[in-house]
Amino acid sequence: MTVELSPRATELAEHARQLLAAGGYNGFSYADLSEKVGIGKASIHHHFPSKADLVLTVVRRHRQQSAAGLAAMQQHIGDDPQAQLSAYVDYWARCIRDGSSTMCICAMLAAEAPMIPPEIAAEVRGYFQDLSEWLAAVISQGQAKAQFKPEAAAPVEALALMSTVHGAMLTARALGDPEAFQTIVRAAIHRLAV
């Protein structure tokens, strides 16, 4: 299902995404969003009756954008699994370095899973399932092409790499060192290739 939004709702969703990446579900309110966008809370409620509606929309958009981004990257790079993994982690390295997105919103929301509405938690799980399946497919292709020699089955390696990528985001944030992300994830990819 594609999420279609008006220009104002798109603007609200994008600012909400930034607030989610910075502080998670409980880290912002409609008052914060109102201040950031420069409209009243009533106008926000017109587009998104509740915070849960807003965040669910943001997560669905993130999921769609991620899937489209991975597909476009694969099409651009071609059939080179190692280059695909490198491009994936390089994307996040750039986002962390330039500050445009220092943390995946789904990672932030996953940490809050017991406290967020179930429909949002389900969408977050879907994001991680999608990503894990993509990573497993890339790792399997890399194994078939003798680019990777994983120690475990591709789905297990995918979960490990996914956990490493999101943990590296957290580490880079905690240390205040964007380069820590790249160092950690490059080591993980190197272990696959050895």
Predicted feature residues:
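All-alpha amphipathic helical-bundle segments outside canonical DNA-binding/catalytic cores
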Residues: 82-83, 122-126, 144-160, 179
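Helix-turn-helix
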Residues: 5, 11, 15-57
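Amphipathic alpha-helical segments used for helix-helix packing
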Residues: 83-84, 98-119
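C-terminal peripheral helix-coil segments that are non-catalytic and often amphipathic
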Residues: 2, 83, 87-94, 129-141, ...
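Hydrophobic alpha-helical connector segments
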Residues: 57, 61, 71-102, 154-161
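Amphipathic, non-transmembrane alpha-helical scaffold segments
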Residues: 55, 59, 63, 121-132
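Hydrophobic alpha-helical segments that form the core
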Residues: 107, 152-171, 187
